[in-house]
């Protein structure tokens, strides 16, 4: 059987909120979900609260070293948490909940540095302020406990994926196409669940759309659809050691930044903007497909979540890339498994809050490379 966490010995059943703002930095996804031992989680409400451009600019600026970072980081964290609180209040309103109905809020924060090789990962957050604004217990800082145990602190969602999406006798891959792409391999046989970051996804696709169109993202992949994949540029983009590094591994904007893209584009000034976009879309698809071919060649189904699930051009590119890599797998979204793709990441952090409350581990050492399974998170009481 695939590796799975046991059911809580001391149930912490109840309603939890999960908040996730990913590397696309466009806003926060939230869910209200009820967890009961031995039953599938039940989503009571979902919400999305966007970020103002001024906040997005501040968050993007913090991705790179700069002056007076401590002050800028603290001010941005407070503005970020104000949006988190709005999301929580919207979840309460939609689900008809009082604050006393909610056991805890699991909040990821906004990653501004991810350098586990140097012993840290930094998620911008102010959980104390969120507890004050919502009057609900807040559980945050999930990644550092895994890093402290020698792991990458990422990805953390595979433990949740194994609980919700695993099927005995059926090898599946769950692929999150957020700012960064990552996969979870749920094997049919009794081997461990595996998962890791594959490379850039919407982080570069969105950045190029913003630069060329003045829009925050490539709506439906229409910009990419106007172009043609430039083979030489794709080869240059794939000429990055991360793509062939063995797992466990994780990455982020620290590596796959606008500066990285500009350096790769330096010798391709003649390539039309729409062809660059088509090639960035292909980069995401090919990097994911090659990792699946290396580590889960026998999988029959790939289920996509994250913002990329709303990009049909990207999904078609993934289908083609899998076929070219020799992987005979269907590609669908997690909606086919009963979970809308935009909910998956927020659900994972609600689940991690549930695990913390039960004092049960939330990581998989087979995924992150940690010395063992650990209880993840820190509590900020209401």
Swiss-Prot record:
Q: Using the UniProt record, name the top-level EC class of this enzyme in a single word.
A: transferase
Cite the Pfam families for this sequence.
Answer: AnmK
**Record pathway:** Amino-sugar metabolism; 1,6-anhydro-N-acetylmuramate degradation; Cell wall biogenesis; peptidoglycan recycling
Q: Which reaction does it catalyse?
A: 1,6-anhydro-N-acetyl-beta-muramate + ATP + H2O = N-acetyl-D-muramate 6-phosphate + ADP + H(+)
Summarize where ATP binds, as residue positions.
22-29
EC numbers on record: 2.7.1.170
Q: Which UniProt keywords apply?
A: ATP-binding, Carbohydrate metabolism, Kinase, Nucleotide-binding, Transferase
What Gene3D superfamilies does the annotation carry? 3.30.420.40
InterPro entries the UniProt entry points to: Anhydro_N_Ac-Mur_kinase, ATPase_NBD
User: Which PANTHER family does the record cross-reference, listed alphabetically?
Assistant: ANHYDRO-N-ACETYLMURAMIC ACID KINASE
Please explain the role this protein plays, according to its UniProt record: Catalyzes the specific phosphorylation of 1,6-anhydro-N-acetylmuramic acid (anhMurNAc) with the simultaneous cleavage of the 1,6-anhydro ring, generating MurNAc-6-P. Is required for the utilization of anhMurNAc either imported from the medium or derived from its own cell wall murein, and thus plays a role in cell wall recycling.
Tell me the protein's name: Anhydro-N-acetylmuramic acid kinase
